[in-house]
Amino acid sequence: MKALLDLFKQVQQEEQFDAIKIGLASPEKIRSWSYGEVKKPETINYRTFKPERDGLFCAKIFGPIKDYECLCGKYKRLKHRGVICEKCGVEVTLAKVRRERMGHIELAAPTAHIWFLKSLPSRLGMVLDMTLRDIERVLYFEAFVVIEPGMTPLKKSQIMSEDDYLAKCDEYGEGEFVAMMGAEGIRELLRGIDIEKQIEQIRAELQATGSEAKIKKFAKRLKVLEAFQRSGIKPEWMILEVLPVLPPELRPLVPLDGGRFATSDLNDLYRRVINRNNRLKRLLELKAPEIIVRNEKRMLQEAVDSLLDNGRRGKAMTGANKRPLKSLAEMIKGKGGRFRQNLLGKRVDYSGRSVIVVGPTLKLHQCGLPKLMALELFKPFIFHKLETMGIATTIKAAKKEVESQTPVVWDILEEVIREHPVMLNRAPTLHRLGIQAFEPVLIEGKAIQLHPLVCAAFNADFDGDQMAVHVPLSLEAQMEARTLMLASNNVLFPANGDPSIVPSQDVVLGLYYTTRDKINGRGEGMTFADISEVIRAYENKEVELASRVNVRITEYELVDKDAEGDARFAPKITLQATTVGRAILSEILPKGLPFSVLNKPLKKKEISRLINTAFRKCGLRETVIFADKLLQSGFRLATRAGISIAIDDMLVPPQKEKIIAEASAKVKEYDKQYMSGLVTDQERYNNVVDIWGAAGDQVGKAMMEQLQHEDVVDREGKTVKQESFNSIYMMADSGARGSAAQIRQLAGMRGLMAKPDGSIIETPITANFREGLNVLQYFISTHGARKGLADTALKTANSGYLTRRLVDVTQDLVVVEDDCGTSNGVAMKALVEGGEVIEALRDRILGRVTVADVVNPETQETAIEAGTLLDEDLVELIDNIGVDEVKVRTPLSCDTRYGLCGKCYGRDLGRGVLVNSGEAVGVIAAQSIGEPGTQLTMRTFHIGGAASRAAVASSVEAKATGTVRFTATMRYVTNAKGELIVISRSGEALITDDHGRERERHKIPYGATLLVQDGQAIKAGTQLATWDALTRPIVSEYTGTTKFENVEEGVTVAKQMDEVTGLSTLVVIDAKRRTAATKGIRPQVKLLDANGQEVKIPGTDHSVTIGFQVGALITVKDGQQVHVGEVLARIPTESQKTRDITGGLPRVAELFEARSPKDAAVLAEVTGTTSFGKDTKGKQRLVITDLDGNAHEFLIAKEKQVLVHDGQVVNKGEMIVEGPADPHDILRLKGIEELAHYIVDEVQDVYRLQGVKINDKHIEVIVRQMLRRVQIADVGDTKFIPGEQVERSELLDENDRVIAEGKRPATYENLLLGITKASLSTDSFISAASFQETTRVLTEAAIMGKTDDLRGLKENVIVGRLIPAGTGLAYHRARKAREASERERAQAIAEEEQSLFIEPAPVVQATTEGEGDNA
């Protein structure tokens, strides 16, 4: 009996822990883990297959092979448990101890651990302050290192070759100094380090030195040494004296059939180490010559290196099959390593997979599960039921019963499955809607049935897709699956809050067809009393679906909510002019929605809006029911409509021939011009591509116009146009299938095709698919098609990698509190570009929390108080009262440490309410950005040719009526003709309405002519400014006579004759094409006043100097009188090289990796006045003198165009040299808010181009994570090192601690890290190691003696705990609270006991004596 009880004891309680620490193991520690030394390289005996004693699989060291049975068989069974057999020395216990018992090898010579040697930066090198090369020479016995110089002039840790050593021995005599080779030498050096003293020394040197490089070097070394000091790890432990041996079950040797064995590579590696070690021991005993011993020691070092990390140094060790052996390091790193394969990617019990088919009869929360699959998945539940019902007495009997599939089993299965949700998953699971829970409905057959409306979320179709089924087993799991994951509870996309259950294809077509109207349909103009009358008329064929009729329709308006919160509705009957189809459809409308939402043709977008409105007005349940009804009606009506397409539906426009002929003629004209040398080949190509592009568009337009309308006769007998009922047009117009571009290929012309490299082939395909392609045309079109397929494959991999990096950087961001109480936020405006509103203010602030009160601009009353979550009604209100800027909370300015607060995040888009505590918003953000990644292009766009020419604007006009206002940055001068010429680079014109609210804003480029004044009232359509689109002018801001400097023909400028006009102009030559002597000269012009003095910039003593950049055409002569606003030179924009803009996925990755772009813009570091200093070789020197008179210098490459000129006042962060912005500069000069604006806008631009909607807050969450580290500037009294990078929350905690003690806090600068870098530099080493660069991360963590607090999700998954998010957050909080209270209780009890013992001690004694007497 006792034995049985002991068995129960063996199931150990898993330990509760809050952190995991990693460190270096001392030799003593390794010996303490070990159960014995492995002395022989043998594994198992080839005849008996029993492990050899003292070998790598020794049962004495590692434990028995069979449960409770010693090796020789003397002791068997449980009763001998714990006995150690005296014959074979094996302890009688469970065989699974062979998974946990370790052995060790006593190394005859110490060896260095390769990770600390070779993983860059070399940790050994840092501690010893030696170069890696030197240490390697010592370790591999090529050089000596001085350990103890004694009285000689040698220095400690000096390296010398063998010859040197012998020479020095002769010089100073043997034994006067100690020098050693190999790991022993390094170990002695490490032992000799006095860490405390070193730290003091370095700190002193840090204070003293001024050089940047030295500070960096010292700081690095200091960090490592302080880590050693703090963690109590001794540096000499980086050298191994004892090698631990992995438990044998983790490096198994398994017999294959045919007498061969398969073994883990580790056994080979261990065997090599043991062989060499034993040989070395023997050589040392034999007192072999030094050179032989040295060689053996080197080989031992190499063997140990290979075991730890094969191939890290020198050639990798290979096995019998010439393949490099897989070492310990390879076991844990990479996709197939321990972390990603086994800890983060586990396989799941109780799962199955099958093909999916459509289940049109299912409700939204159901799925069809094949009976056989369900029987297998729910087996344990069925067994249990069979036993409780008494049908089967044992599990074995129950199994038999189930396998015979008797009717009673099916009944039980029905019962078991009732209300037990299952989870369906479709790979790739790109966002949280890729796994949803459904209630299973048992079906015959072998395919899973899926509801059509959830296909959009799963991105599933029925062309052979497969899905996996998982069964949640525990009650908690079932409950969570039902409440959080049930398909009917997930009707919105978490990425943007739009409904995910939108009908598509057939359903859309059916609904569209039903809600279209037509002129002069059967029964037009009839009036009906109610909908049943309409249905009766329709069934008797008195009216047709699209006929326009009048019907009395009952709508239900929301009156109020009663005590239970149920809505009360009041019916309202109105006569509506509508169509038969819409009236019939209105029967399924939920109460609370007006009929007007249906009284229009329902295209896909409209249906999406309809479901969205239903969700916001009527709630989740009604919406789901409504969506299901829409689906049923749509299918039914699509079937009734009987829409089909025939070749005749593709109408080829009659104008096509003419358009193509005209285009061909134009192309011939250009060819002629090219032949006669008037245009270059590139220009000809650009124009040809342009012409064909335009022709294709024209044909397409003509075709759409023809498809779109048809002529019909109305009731008066007149012929009128109405929207066409052409099947193809209806499909495209409704959004059911196809698009205008696809129809254009069917019935217009296919147009231009691209080569695989993305360049456009200049001969277009003039045919369409209806006419058919000839062989050449077919061949050209295969190009593009093939590239498309190759692109898709690449895109998927790249997109997946981006998602992985995003998830990794945000995985620990969870909503941990409701409100952090910050008063910071960001001011949101509508997004306007080129005068067009791209994103309205209402869309940007929906679902955010206000920071400040929103004030009605007309009455100045508070319309919405601070701290309000803006829902649809409130943004509508903001829109109506005309507020154009709202300050809202943002994840970026949230003050919560180690997480986010609900108020800063705002609405949980997937649920439509304020986010709950415990929501893993980081992962959701990562998924929302990564999931549409596959839809983005891989292309880098070539601007140039067709693309750019269409986009060049040369004027800007107002779209709204209002008043013109110029921004503060706008500067302009009036020229001789009285025109206003803009001389600012970043000026904008705003147009405001009567209340002074901004309606639109336009950038006005430098050199433009303004046609309006500041404060002028204008009508819509008024031109605001015009400019020359093809050249960029250089405008004079002063009046005077020109005086050229360095403008020498044939040196800095060249004369160009215009062939057509015969006029000559001077063009500035590229510095690279000049002779060496003249390279540094800049052509420029100064202005002289009437007295011949140089014109100065007002308020300074700088002369006005205007530099001409390369390629500028100088339009004035030397000594010419110029006026303010006159053009001095023009720079042709055509001569700017065609830039590649990175688009699509690479651009998103570039932004999130925070890469500095090539040729980045230079921004002004300070606010001040500019002037040019003396030029250096190939560089211009720009000086900005700030307001205090300090000069800041910039060196700018000669060929760059400097946007400022002498004496101009620039603001901090203003662009000085054109180019793409560098996010790091934006952060440094303009702050976090500007940076976030920049990244959000840039990322959104890429997605918007593809028509993907992502909410801004997801991108902000990622930016928050990119900004989570700071760099220490001034240490104050904190524990940090100058220039150290630390987590923001860690710094704030430390500063709080220091301030509380009344000391000086540290100051810091914000750091922007790319997502890969941010993931690797996270405080959790477990998370970082499982992401990338496993070796480096673990090496660093071990030396630092890091502790992982298991804050993020990933670390907890890896150690196998509940994640601290969702329901797990509450669990962990409760657990921590419980532990704290238990600790307090224990302490209280201890104190109580103590107090009892102290005071009444004598009394206790007395009573004892008394008792004794009585006894």
UniProtKB/Swiss-Prot annotation:
Binding positions for Zn(2+) 2 per the UniProt entry: C820, C894, C901, C904
InterPro entries hit by this protein: DNA-dir_RpoC_beta_prime, DNA-dir_RpoC_beta_prime_bact, RNA_pol_asu, RNA_pol_N, RNA_pol_Rpb1_1, RNA_pol_Rpb1_3, RNA_pol_Rpb1_3_sf, RNA_pol_Rpb1_4
Any Gene Ontology biological process: DNA-templated transcription
Molecular functions (GO terms): DNA binding; DNA-directed RNA polymerase activity; magnesium ion binding; zinc ion binding
Top class in the EC scheme: transferase
Binding site for Mg(2+): D461, D463, D465
Cofactor(s) for this UniProt protein: Mg(2+); Zn(2+)
GO CC aspect terms: DNA-directed RNA polymerase complex
CDD domains hit by this protein: RNAP_beta'_C, RNAP_beta'_N
Superkingdom to which the source organism belongs: Bacteria
UniProt cross-references to SUPFAM superfamilies, sorted A to Z: beta and beta-prime subunits of DNA dependent RNA-polymerase
Cystine residue pairs: none
Family (UniProt): Belongs to the RNA polymerase beta' chain family.
PANTHER family associated with the record: DNA-DIRECTED RNA POLYMERASE (PTHR19376), DNA-DIRECTED RNA POLYMERASE SUBUNIT BETA (PTHR19376:SF54)
Subunit details: The RNAP catalytic core consists of 2 alpha, 1 beta, 1 beta' and 1 omega subunit. When a sigma factor is associated with the core the holoenzyme is formed, which can initiate transcription.
Protein name: DNA-directed RNA polymerase subunit beta'
Organism placement in taxonomy: Bacteria, Pseudomonadati, Pseudomonadota, Betaproteobacteria, Burkholderiales
